[in-house]
UniProtKB/Swiss-Prot annotation:
GTP binds at residues 20-26, 37-38, 40, 42-43, 69, 124-125, 127, 155-156. Its cofactor is Mg(2+). It is found in: Cell membrane; Endosome membrane; Recycling endosome membrane; Cleavage furrow. This is Ras-related protein Rab-11A. It comes from Gallus gallus (Chicken). The modification N-acetylglycine is found at G2. SUPFAM superfamilies: P-loop containing nucleoside triphosphate hydrolases (SSF52540).
Amino acid sequence: MGNRDDEYDYLFKVVLIGDSGVGKSNLLSRFTRNEFNLESKSTIGVEFATRSIQVDGKTIKAQIWDTAGQERYRAITSAYYRGAVGALLVYDIAKHLTYENVERWLKELRDHADSNIVIMLVGNKSDLRHLRAVPTDEARAFAEKNGLSFIETSALDSTNVEAAFQTILTEIYRIVSQKQMSDRRENDMSPSNNVVPIHVPPTTENKPKMQCCQNI
């Protein structure tokens, strides 16, 4: 028998992107294992973790990928984005430069990923309110202008981490399930599904046999 963790209705690949040090790895570990590591070092290469959630009675298995934000690891981008249906674009609310770089990350994402990818802008480290360098309203306005959803999180104290992943996975599920319904409707209406078979009764007359419309 298979592992229960292997039983799912949908598998969605979601990537974490953003500058190094914004807390991508801790967002991943908080959501998938409910862990936080203050000594977390920069991720080298690529790693991913999985967790399943329920949406509308369906089991959604999220495969969440994390990679280092440093420029020297950019060689992995094409493989990293391949097959991704969602992305969390993360910045640190206490470091304005990480927010300034969001635009560059967004461009890279749109250059490499599927055009229909669902993107959420995430302002992480909301627990550092006293050090805030990026106003919430400014980030929200940027997200709205670029068609992104937006949330502020804290991997340290768990604030909104669950909500961020649940929101993006639910949005992906809605899009995928609506597309499946639309495809089914189109399939039901296609000519091949509307063929009415015509039965010609056999005749006893000795007429030459003709094959007509055999391939229709």
